[in-house]
Regions:
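Metal-dependent catalytic neighborhoods of phosphoester/phosphodiester hydrolases
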Residues: 70-77, 102, 225-232
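Conserved beta-strand hairpin/beta-sheet module of binuclear metal-dependent hydrolase folds
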Residues: 1-48, 144-160, 177
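Active-site metal-binding motif and surrounding structural segment of the metallo-beta-lactamase
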Residues: 40-90, 118
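Active-site neighborhood of phospho(di)ester-bond hydrolases with catalytic His/Asp-centered motifs
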Residues: 34-38, 56-66, 92, 156-162, ...
Length: 248
């Protein structure tokens, strides 16, 4: 059963003193999963109180460094703790080579117990305890996938690094929680389109069309101050949540 989510990192491109780059934790009754693992994720994950024994899945949306830069260090720390249970890594076809080469180029053995799933070949997956994943491709400069995670009663959708697209609306349809990128404010929508990103207003329009229950925005340009993004409201609720676990 899906229980909680937490934004571990919400900065786009580069971390700031206050915001880490992209990572989200989702907790179920039986296990935890991580979506994206930007630079510095391990420290924020540890401070948030998560434990190795519960982490069973890491999902990667795409291979840009602000979404993968913390992954090899994270897996290295896992190796140092001698964690024995299988960790399933789900993501683009390049993910396995990225990790294998990262360990090899560092002179480290990659002898942990991993399983690999290429998301381009497996758009729908059954995980554990009735939790399922469905994915759809988004519109970014490189291949990027959105994730819908659901059980028999709840659903959470994570969409990042994309133009506003009908696939986002379809994937998020009637979800309990939509976590969507909002790299730019709407007055910079031409720049957002140039860089294949979404504005805050476009994300809200996607939430409206998809009839989601709760919208949470993430992946903010470092140029946007906390004061600006904390003013964003959708359906009477704040769209920005920092460093707190939330019920799905």
């Amino acid at each position: 059963m899906l229980k909680t989510y937490q934004i571990i990192g919400c900065s786009a491109g580069v971390p700031t003193q206050e915001r880490g780059v992209s990572s989200v934790m989702i907790s179920t009754s039986n296990f935890d999963m991580m979506i994206d693992c930007g630079e510095g994720t391990y420290l924020r994950w540890q401070k948030a109180g998560y434990e190795w024994k519960n982490l069973k899945f890491i999902l990667i949306t795409h291979m840009h460094p602000d979404h993968t830069g913390g992954l090899i260090p994270f897996l290295f720390y896992r190796k140092l703790f001698s964690i024995e249970h299988t960790l399933t890594l789900i993501g683009p076809p390049q993910l396995e080579t990225f990790i294998t080469d990262g360990f090899q180029n560092s002179g480290l053995s990659n002898d942990q117990n991993y399983s690999w799933i290429d998301i381009s070949q497996n758009p729908e997956l059954n995980l554990q305890a009735g939790v399922k994943i469905r994915t759809m491709k988004m519109k970014h400069k490189i291949p990027c996938w959105g994730y819908r995670i659901e059980d028999s009663s709840k659903s959470l959708v994570f969409i990042t690094d994309t133009l506003a697209t009908s696939n986002a609306v379809e994937l998020a349809q009637n979800s309990d929680v939509l976590i969507h990128e909002a790299t730019f404010t709407h007055d910079m929508r031409e720049k957002a389109a140039e860089h294949f990103h979404t504005t805050n207003i476009q994300a809200m329009e996607i939430a409206d069309k998809a009839r989601v229950k709760r919208l949470v925005l993430t992946h903010f340009s470092p140029r946007l101050s906390d004061g600006i993004i904390q003013e964003w409201i959708w359906e009477g609720q704040p769209c920005v949540i920092f460093d707190e676990r939330q019920e799905i």
